[in-house]
Amino acid sequence: MLHFYIARCADNSLYCGSCKDLQSRENIHNTGKGAKYTRSRRPIRIVYSEEFPTLSEAMRREAQVKRWTKAQKEMLIRKHIRQ
């Protein structure tokens, strides 16, 4: 399965991405080898994810959520935690 994820950075900002392996991707971000955005905001923690059958679907969801405000992303995370 492929994943769309939201990571919370050390400065409390949110980063959206997509990947095959969530744990591996979190480790890559935390070793400074991930996205430029997260390199100066370590450590990061993946706080939300969704599974998709294809990478293109995961990336489509990533593009959609990246356009949202931080408040909308926080609401999505909170709804997920309550479930």
Residue positions per predicted region:
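GIY-YIG nuclease catalytic motif and its immediate N-terminal context
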Residues: 1-66, 70-83
